[in-house]
Curated annotation (Swiss-Prot):
Protein name: 3-isopropylmalate dehydrogenase
Pfam families: Iso_dh
Ranges in a coiled coil: none
Any one GO biological process: L-leucine biosynthetic process
Lineage: Bacteria, Thermotogati, Deinococcota, Deinococci, Thermales
EC number, UniProt record: 1.1.1.85
Organism: Thermus thermophilus (strain ATCC BAA-163 / DSM 7039 / HB27)
Encoding gene, per UniProt annotation: leuB
């Protein structure tokens, strides 16, 4: 288990250390053979090397089996040219590893339904995974451009691009509730028709997983009206960008949301939240998303599904027993992490 750890900026080092404490405890109990090395990334790397994704970090990522990332950015670096800002390091990291699938779970933890903007009876039981295609579609399609009179972008997908992200979704569903919803706009767009047909072809290789199709506008409505009925949702880049942000508000705090980016190279696991420089160093950061990102790493990088579920269960118990400040409690980073570790033991 060789992991490159990129703590980053702001609260990144604090929440990443919390995740590492959990991983070290599991390693001691289960003999996982955990080996990790810490590398500078984002603003911290700019301060040390003059660029957000320097060569030593790049080499460390290439040699690792997984990347555990904290958070990047902060007002200190906002005045830099765009091409060397901390956030540019994220784009370079994802591109260098050809990470084509972004996994964003949104789970309303039992007992915390009150945090959701939805009614408690609607929020109860929500546990949805959005699988977003990350490197194709209208964000990257050519031609694109703008003149004084008009602007244009191209929505384009190849069969291999759709097939590979669909497989990620079906494989994830096999470990969950065995239900995939594919989201498109096949009633209007040829790309949507192509997407739907290709996902259906991939789905035939997973007879144990149910496949359903939804138009993106209807799906947005369903995620608000009845989100608990969904398991795994797979869609293209722009629709996934929108739907994953919609789903992210369901649990009630960004501090609860992990993510994974998978592809041909080293997979990356990171919290959805930002660097929160206003609370950095105060011991107040909620490490839940970082700990759950480590759980996703156990599952998707190393196939340790049972251990990942064990971490998730410990986090769920800790959230009820010792909620962090952003959830209305008073448990700081260390106290919350200690509670998770106690429930893991």
């Amino acid at each position: 288990m060789k992991v490159a750890v990129l703590p980053g900026d702001g609260i990144g080092p604090e929440v990443t250390e919390a995740a590492l404490k959990v991983l070290r405890a599991l390693d001691e109990a289960e003999g996982l053979g955990l080996a990790y090395e810490v590398f500078p990334f984002g603003g911290a790397a700019i301060d040390a090397f003059g660029e957000p994704f320097p060569e030593p970090t790049r080499k460390g990522v290439e040699e690792a089996e997984a990347v555990l990332l904290g958070s990047v950015g902060g007002p200190k670096w906002d005045g830099l040219p765009r091409k060397i800002r901390p956030e540019t390091g994220l784009l370079s990291l994802r591109k260098s590893q050809d990470l084509f699938a972004n996994l964003r779970p949104a789970k309303v933890f039992p007992g915390l339904e009150r945090l959701s903007p939805l009614k408690e009876e609607i929020a109860r039981g929500v546990d949805v995974l959005i699988v977003r295609e990350l490197t194709g579609g209208i964000y990257f399609g050519e031609p694109r451009g703008m003149s004084e009179a008009e602007a244009w972008n191209t929505e384009r997908y190849s069969k291999p691009e759709v097939e590979r992200v669909a497989r990620v979704a079906f494989e994830a569903a096999r470990k969950r509730r065995k239900h995939v919803v594919s989201v498109d706009k096949a009633n209007v767009l040829e790309v949507g028709e192509f997407w739907r047909k290709t996902v259906e072809e991939v789905g035939r290789g997973y007879p144990d997983v149910a496949l359903e199709h939804q138009y993106v506008d209807a799906m947005a409505m369903h995620l608000v009206r009845s989100p608990a009925r969904f398991d795994v949702v797979v869609t293209g880049n722009i629709f996934g960008d929108i739907l994953s942000d919609l789903a992210s508000v369901l649990p009630g705090s960004l501090g609860l949301l992990p993510s994974a980016s998978l592809g041909r190279g080293t997979p990356v696991f990171e919290p959805v939240h930002g660097s929160a420089p206003d609370i950095a160093g105060k011991g107040l950061a909620n490490p839940t998303a970082a700990i759950l990102s480590a759980a996703m790493m156990l599952e998707h990088a190393f196939g340790l599904v049972e251990l990942a579920r064990k971490v998730e269960d410990a986090v769920a118990k800790a959230l009820l027993e010792a909620p962090p400040p952003d959830l209305g409690g008073s448990a700081g980073t260390e106290a919350f992490t200690a509670t998770v570790l106690r429930h893991l033991a």
